[in-house]
């Protein structure tokens, strides 16, 4: 007898499904809108914890406005974090830690803002930076910001699969596609050349991850300036989404752990029989609210109880704890994070930091390496506009050495 049961069709969650890219772009629009609002809050004397709280409120508010009435999971893919000048990692203090709750932004420091939203598990994260209380930036801070922008644009171009944007005859396209992608060692060397042009250093273990549905740290990763025993794995390919990170320092680029509470966590795939009721209750709330996306203890219902509840969860490996880290020389650090989609047409920036206004960010240094300059002139994607638009884009690329946010 034939099986008459109807089977639920398998959902295509890849970028081949237009709905997937739409969800990524919806999450990206939310991330950008909240980033702009949070950036405006980063003024001299502002308490970091209050900025983070407001950012998360805005994320929740914007997320509720989309995909109304549909059974689609949606939420925060990364809590609002604001990292002071020498901090390397995202920083999100707690209200219940009295001393850290009083931490304020200082005039002239580079504050790194990171946050993100997710729709149906498709998360976008963005990190950008502001110089607190300064409209014009000169000197070493300008060197750092300029270097980070161009290093980031260079990395994005090195992630375009070989031959993807090649023109000419079919034979020429095949030849371009047969070229090998740059190795992670070669990528690191090229990025370091940009950093050195501005007398900066790459922050060790700066890591870009492949994103997947409900996962922001998949199998593939690119690690710049890797430390001892650390290496990246995998080559970017069509159909993938990546979170591309760039971090530079005015110091050595070496990193040290900071004597601060670890407040940023993420659910792992490990299972463990938690013994304490408080631990089980905390984990249950985490899974319900955040799935496997990062969260701050500040976002849980009872912050003080959460500080106790996560201890066994971390010890049992069901939660990953992100240790606060800073520059070993206490030097200013910059950091950017761009979420990209790699399609048959090239790289699309889903979320991206703003291009610095170089009429206000004034470095007296510049890139002179011809190889670097040629790579920076490459497009990130195939042009789909008119001939006039193509010519305008070409002129702009030559003028700025890199493309603007797409």
Residue spans of the language-model regions?
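Active-site neighborhoods and metal-handling regions in enzymes and metal-associated proteins
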Residues: 1-406
